[in-house]
Swiss-Prot record:
Any GO BP annotation: glycolytic process
GO MF term (any one): phosphoglycerate mutase activity
UniProt cross-references to Gene3D superfamilies, sorted A to Z: Alkaline Phosphatase, subunit A
Name of the encoding gene: apgM
Protein name: 2,3-bisphosphoglycerate-independent phosphoglycerate mutase
Organism annotation: Methanococcus maripaludis (strain C5 / ATCC BAA-1333)
Pathway(s) served: Carbohydrate degradation; glycolysis; pyruvate from D-glyceraldehyde 3-phosphate: step 3/5
NCBIfam families to which the protein is assigned, alphabetical: apgM (TIGR00306), PRK04024.1 (NF003104)
Catalytic activity: (2R)-2-phosphoglycerate = (2R)-3-phosphoglycerate
Amino acid sequence: MKAVIFIMDGLGDRPNKDGNTPLKEAKTPVMDKMAKDGICGLMNAVDVGVRPGSDTAHLAILGYDPYTTYTGRGPFEACGVGVTVKPGDIAFRCNFSSVNENFIVTDRRAGRIEDTSELEKELDGLKIDDIDIIFKESGGYRAALVLRGPGLSDKISDADPKKEGKRVKEIHPLDNSKEAKKTAEIVNKLLKIAYEKLDKHPVNEERRKQNLPVANMIVPRGVGQVPEIMQFSEKTGLKGACIAGTGLIKGIAKMVGLDVIDVEGCDGTPNSDLMAKACAIVETLKDYDFILVNVKGADEAGHDGNYELKKEIIEKIDEMLDYITKNIDKDEVYIAMSGDHSTPIEEMDHSADPLPILIWGKSVRVDDVEKFDEFSTYKGGLNWIKGTNIMPILMDLMSIAKKYGA
């Protein structure tokens, strides 16, 4: 038996004035058929009432306790874009953002700029005092930053003001150590250098001509050191792979030992080639026991507060699932399908609202649920579970779970 965990990033939502969500209103005949043929429930990736990040959520969904394994998002972002993070390195996730001359943020995602490869070159390889700067774009406005050198600490604050109209925050040490003080000073110097180098860069001059937001600042956050994590194959006995478009999810996969399968045209944006991803899932199942799949677009729409786009992306995912379910053997493959967190249109950010979940495959206890959405699956046989329950349930269905007790 084989298994797929299929995560629709940011899937969940809250009802609008008509009582609908993008998922409830979307035309999803395949998801609904899977719900009818499977076992359903609700799921909180980390815990009830906890607003999870995509990083902590995916760790939990893979069976890892995020409270003991998560040190910050930065190491996963860096790992995901191919940086080999070494002991002592300090890693951050970053946004390219638009700021004015006073560092007031005018667009947190620089107009969702799609190509920042030329801007990356301005920062990667810099040296500030005795610290080497490693900087890699990780798709669109996202990037990873690594500081390498002596006497560093991850006990520092973030630069992200989290809202437009606010100034990029100065980095401060969070303890009294000389290492934290030094690290904060290095990052503050880097932010000034970044603005000087990026503001007049030809890429941004061209964006100004086109009346597009410029990417003239980097905003680091999610600082952390590399955690020690048991490899997925050792933990489960399964040969695992990951198919995802974003650096963060690829980084989590690499950190736990999943092979990352790159798919052309799948970049984690709303324009991602979902049918190419569907084909890759079917092909990858020929060589692997387990696949973690992440489809990002609905989350992007949620963060933008775009109801119609989120609904449209969910309908495209349904078409993707149509291809997958028609080209795999239900008697040989289990699919656990859910989200990693809710990204409600009204919040434009992650929330702790529980997610619909289903498990589809041979010998599941089919319940009475007939539609896959936030309001229907609560009646299902899975009841209300946490993300860390998914892998044990799948392993039990696959008849590879170890018995607890005599």
